[in-house]
Amino acid sequence: MSIILIGFMGAGKSTVAKLLAEEFTDLDKLIEEEIEMPIATFFELFGEADFRKIENEVFELAVQKDIIIATGGGIIENPKNLNVLDRASRVVFLTADFDTLWKRISMDWQNVRPLAQDKEAAQLLFEKRMKDYSLVADLTIDVTDKSPEQIAEQIREKWEIE
């Protein structure tokens, strides 16, 4: 059974997934392979609606495997993805307050985040998404004062993963 990591940008989903399994699936990377371009470029060319459609198709295939999946922060924007998450039995919501996440996002030069160009807009998006993350989560972890290793250990303990 898969473990699916959800949460806002900057919560550490990909970092924690790497600690849980040597072979994990970063949904954003799978999507980039499918669309053959960076997500930020796709957003510019085709918009968010087309991106969410492809994201759902790739996600539906990924959850059929017994793997660790790090999702993009907007996975919950598509009602179809909410249904998939609701059916999944091991969904982990990594959360923190907005200021903590914004600081992480601002310091991350490796990832271009199309929806994180403006702090006020990002905060509105954060507030909008929080409820949906909580609704589908089987485990919620506040990552504010925890290292990625501590978070991974908490997940391992919950589902007795080695």
Curated annotation (Swiss-Prot):
Keywords: Amino-acid biosynthesis, Aromatic amino acid biosynthesis, ATP-binding, Cytoplasm, Kinase, Magnesium, Metal-binding, Nucleotide-binding, Transferase. Signal peptide: none annotated. Its EC number is 2.7.1.71. GO terms for cellular component: cytosol. Substrate binds at residues 28, 52, 73, 129. Mg(2+) binds at residue 14. It is found in: Cytoplasm. It comes from the Bacteria. GO terms for biological process: amino acid biosynthetic process; aromatic amino acid family biosynthetic process; chorismate biosynthetic process. ATP binds at residues 10-15, 113. The keyword Flavoprotein does not apply. One of its GO terms (molecular function) is shikimate kinase activity. Its main location: cytoplasm. It catalyses: shikimate + ATP = 3-phosphoshikimate + ADP + H(+). Pathway: Metabolic intermediate biosynthesis; chorismate biosynthesis; chorismate from D-erythrose 4-phosphate and phosphoenolpyruvate: step 5/7. Pfam families: SKI. Gene3D superfamilies: P-loop containing nucleotide triphosphate hydrolases (3.40.50.300). Binds 1 Mg(2+) ion per subunit. Its cofactor is Mg(2+). Catalyzes the specific phosphorylation of the 3-hydroxyl group of shikimic acid using ATP as a cosubstrate. Belongs to the shikimate kinase family. This is Shikimate kinase. It comes from Lactococcus lactis subsp. cremoris (strain MG1363). The lineage of its organism: Bacteria, Bacillati, Bacillota, Bacilli, Lactobacillales. The gene is aroK.
